[in-house]
Amino acid sequence: MTMTDPIADMLSRVRNANNAHHDAVSMPSSKLKANIAEILKSEGYIADYKVEDAKVGKTLTLDLKYGPNRQRSIEGVRRVSKPGLRVYAKSTNLPQVLGGLGVAIISTSHGLLTDRQATEKGVGGEVLAYVW
């Protein structure tokens, strides 16, 4: 059976592994998931990620990041635009997560961007997820 929402699956795996204090989490890979992982890394939510090419399919492995006393770097993750209800935002009406403390991941014509990058470039798009 095919997966209906691979992005929601990725975010759920990250949330569950983070809550269980795992060091890494693996999942099936795609270009979109790798781009989301790149944004999470550049924003400091994960330590690193790698795409491993197996015989069957590619695997994306995220190395989760914790503070000195095992404090989570990711407090929460929420899927916004879903297959049944797409959510779009104009460049003038981009969402801010927790007043700018979190990150909104937006799919634009310039690729995947954070809310701050999309505001700088003046582009809108589909709001995929919030991370804080």
Swiss-Prot record:
The keyword Ribosomal protein applies. GO terms for biological process: translation. One of its GO terms (molecular function) is structural constituent of ribosome. The keyword Endoplasmic reticulum does not apply. GO terms for cellular component: ribonucleoprotein complex; ribosome. Disulfide bonds: none annotated. Keywords: Ribonucleoprotein, Ribosomal protein, RNA-binding, rRNA-binding. It comes from the Bacteria. One of the primary rRNA binding proteins, it binds directly to 16S rRNA central domain where it helps coordinate assembly of the platform of the 30S subunit. Belongs to the universal ribosomal protein uS8 family. Part of the 30S ribosomal subunit. Contacts proteins S5 and S12. This is Small ribosomal subunit protein uS8. It comes from Corynebacterium diphtheriae (strain ATCC 700971 / NCTC 13129 / Biotype gravis).
